């Protein structure tokens, strides 16, 4: 069972942006795909830090 939290909403939005940017997929915490997605892990980290600070 998965419980709804703001973190899931943030990740969903970032995953959507990742797909639109041409990324292939995310596997084991690393981005696999085109070079344009190299900074995607940094975006996830920043979003997660913002969610943690908001608590």
From Swiss-Prot:
Query: Miscellaneous notes for this chain?
Result: The basic functional RuBisCO is composed of a large chain homodimer in a 'head-to-tail' conformation. In form I RuBisCO this homodimer is arranged in a barrel-like tetramer with the small subunits forming a tetrameric 'cap' on each end of the 'barrel'.
Q: Where in the cell is it found?
A: Plastid, Chloroplast
| Segment forming the signal sequence | none
Keyword check for Ribosomal protein? no
Protein name, per record: Ribulose bisphosphate carboxylase large chain
Class in the EC hierarchy, top level: lyase
| The family this protein is said to belong to | Belongs to the RuBisCO large chain family. Type I subfamily.
- EC no. given is 4.1.1.39
GO cellular component terms, A-Z: chloroplast
Q: Catalytic positions?
A: 18
Organism for this UniProt entry: Vitis sp. (Grape)
